[in-house]
Amino acid sequence: MSMRATRVGEQMKKELGDILGRKLKDPRIGFLTVTDVEVSGDLQIAKVYISVLGDEKKREETLKGLAKAKGYIRSEIGNRIRLRKTPELHFEFDESVDYGNRIESLIAELNTKDHE
């Protein structure tokens, strides 16, 4: 990824956190965190990685709400960041958070077995 794409991704991450936390009022969108934004080299596509608090059903509802609000979110980003063309947003779940929690629980389980 180019240096410019990295900078745009970081700025988008900051702005998306604000937009999703303060501007959106969709009840389907629960408590979520933008963990990363990867912007393509030509600045046309942005993969937005999110982490959602809740079960699988809540995660799916959040994704549906984000898909419905994608146009509004993109226009807000366009108003806040000066780019010739605002990147197309693609929302994806960040599996690394769940993976990290799973590893942590396995290590804790091993530690309790060692102390017994």
From Swiss-Prot:
Matches recorded under Gene3D superfamilies: 3.30.300.20
Q: Which residues form a coiled coil?
A: none
The record's Gene Ontology biological-process terms are:
maturation of SSU-rRNA
GO molecular function: any one? ribosomal small subunit binding
Q: What does this protein do?
A: One of several proteins that assist in the late maturation steps of the functional core of the 30S ribosomal subunit. Associates with free 30S ribosomal subunits (but not with 30S subunits that are part of 70S ribosomes or polysomes). Required for efficient processing of 16S rRNA. May interact with the 5'-terminal helix region of 16S rRNA.
Q: Which locations, inside or outside the cell, does it occupy? A: Cytoplasm
Q: Which domain of life is it from?
A: Bacteria
Quote the subunit structure annotation: Monomer. Binds 30S ribosomal subunits, but not 50S ribosomal subunits or 70S ribosomes.
Where is it chiefly localized?
cytoplasm
Q: Which family does it belong to?
A: Belongs to the RbfA family.
| One GO cellular component term | cytosol
Would the keyword Cytoplasm be found if you checked this record's keyword annotation?
A: yes
Q: Does the keyword Cytoplasm apply?
A: yes
Question: Which UniProt keywords are given for this protein, alphabetically ordered?
Answer: Cytoplasm, Ribosome biogenesis
Q: What is this protein called?
A: Ribosome-binding factor A
